[in-house]
């Protein structure tokens, strides 16, 4: 490394190999927060859809810092989170070889949007999914069998999770009709309490504010924006070769020694970039907006302008946010409309940054398509006045 003054071991992290397309479109929760029996039963994760980004102005609460009581401007992401519907329970047993599925119980009525998930082509299918299972609830023998399955869970299970799905029909920005289905772990209380808690919410909605609170630190799991097949300079960040290099300069000149007579996995190579499964830790919830309530609006204690959270002209490539939403500090994985999994933090947050109370002064709702100057349509009309017809 003759051109460097200091050491630089390599370009690009090897911790995320292989850099290949994710096998799943929705982020998978590979580990849930640690269970605490002393706490009441609660769900540990949720599913949302990325709408877009805007920025806010707030006052910093950091005694002793030069920024204390000063205004700061920060980027935020809006994630639309319509209520989930619980349609099942699944129990797991801890074994020496890891978790093993014990049994599962489903609700009687499953909507069309979740039954679509069990077919590749809904239009050409016979649409028979769960028709036999639903008949169990109509007979005494079937009801008895379901109760026996629940009792079996209470007796043998180590972990209980609910099966929940999104209400994608409420999403105005998405054309997809197939709901996203996932397992969500129930933490708190005894196993019997967890089974009763999950069974109690069969075919009922769970809003986002039942899982997360304002100022909470959460993790976001999702699949990044896909970039396709790209070269080594973009994919790994290696240095471009000098201008006079023969046969291209956006390359790795030496891909290894003669022996061992193979290319090492540590050498930067061209290939797939993006559409990788990633987990982002410690994203702070700045605001929870509830549909049909004042919290859904973008007005604050300092800015009483009547305006909705959706910017003028809608979020580019998404549209209007009509349902519940979360406002998260910073960015988040994936493009617009991408489904993201939201999980409670695995660690107990003790830092001053995590415990800081957020008081928003201003939420920007100017157009995100171009250089937005106005916060509302009325403001724009007042500025321009009556235009010639």
From Swiss-Prot:
Cellular component terms per the entry's GO annotation: cytosolic large ribosomal subunit
Localization (cell): Cytoplasm
Family matches, as Gene3D superfamilies: 3.30.1430.10, Ribosomal protein L3, domain 3, Translation factors
The keyword Transmembrane helix is assigned to this record: no
A GO biological process held by the record: translation
Biased composition (Basic residues): 18-31
PROSITE patterns named among the record's database cross-references: RIBOSOMAL_L3
Region listing for Disordered, in residue ranges: 1-36
Positions of disulphide bridges: none
GO MF term set: RNA binding; structural constituent of ribosome
Keywords (A to Z) from UniProt: Cytoplasm, Ribonucleoprotein, Ribosomal protein
Entry-linked PANTHER family: 60S RIBOSOMAL PROTEIN L3-RELATED, LARGE RIBOSOMAL SUBUNIT PROTEIN UL3
Similarity comment: Belongs to the universal ribosomal protein uL3 family.
Function as written in the Swiss-Prot or TrEMBL entry: The L3 protein is a component of the large subunit of cytoplasmic ribosomes.
Protein name per the record: Large ribosomal subunit protein uL3
Protein source organism: Oryza sativa subsp. japonica
Highest classification ranks of the organism: Eukaryota, Viridiplantae, Streptophyta, Embryophyta, Tracheophyta
């Amino acid at each position: 490394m003759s051109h460097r003054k200091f050491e630089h071991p390599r370009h690009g992290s090897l911790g995320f190999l292989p850099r290949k397309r994710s096998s799943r479109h929705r982020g998978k929760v590979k580990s849930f927060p640690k269970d605490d029996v002393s706490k009441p039963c609660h769900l540990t994760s949720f599913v949302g859809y990325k709408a877009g980004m805007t920025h806010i102005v707030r006052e910093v609460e950091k005694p002793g810092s030069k920024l204390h009581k000063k205004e700061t401007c920060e980027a935020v992401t809006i994630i639309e989170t319509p209520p989930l519907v619980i349609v099942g329970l699944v129990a797991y047993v801890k074994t020496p070889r890891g978790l093993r599925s014990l049994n599962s119980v489903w609700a009687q009525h499953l909507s069309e949007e979740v039954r679509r998930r069990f077919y590749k082509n809904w239009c050409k299918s016979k649409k028979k999914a769960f028709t036999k299972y639903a008949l169990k609830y109509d007979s005494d023998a079937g009801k008895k069998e379901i109760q026996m399955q629940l009792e079996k869970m209470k007796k043998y299970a180590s972990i209980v999770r609910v099966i929940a799905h999104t209400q994608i029909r409420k999403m105005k920005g998405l054309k997809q009709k197939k709901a996203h289905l996932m397992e969500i772990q129930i933490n708190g209380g005894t196993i019997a309490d967890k089974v009763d808690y999950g069974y109690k919410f069969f075919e009922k909605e769970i809003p986002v504010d039942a899982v997360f609170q304002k100022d909470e630190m959460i993790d976001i799991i999702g699949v990044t924006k896909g970039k396709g097949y790209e070269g080594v300079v973009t994919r790994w960040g290696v240095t471009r070769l000098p201008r006079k290099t023969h046969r291209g300069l956006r390359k790795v000149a030496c891909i290894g020694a003669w022996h061992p007579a193979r290319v090492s996995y540590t050498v930067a190579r061209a290939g797939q970039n993006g559409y990788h499964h990633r987990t982002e830790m410690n994203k702070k919830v700045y605001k929870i907006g509830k549909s049909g309530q004042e919290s859904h609006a973008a007005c604050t204690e300092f800015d009483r302008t009547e305006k909705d959270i959706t910017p003028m002209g809608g979020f580019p490539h998404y549209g209007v946010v009509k349902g519940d939403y979360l406002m998260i500090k910073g960015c988040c994985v994936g493009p617009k409309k991408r489904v993201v999994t939201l999980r409670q933090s695995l660690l107990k947050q003790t830092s001053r940054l995590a415990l800081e109370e957020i008081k928003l002064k201003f939420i920007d709702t100017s157009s995100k398509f171009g250089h937005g100057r106005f916060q509302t349509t009325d403001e724009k009309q007042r500025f321009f006045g009556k235009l010639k017809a």
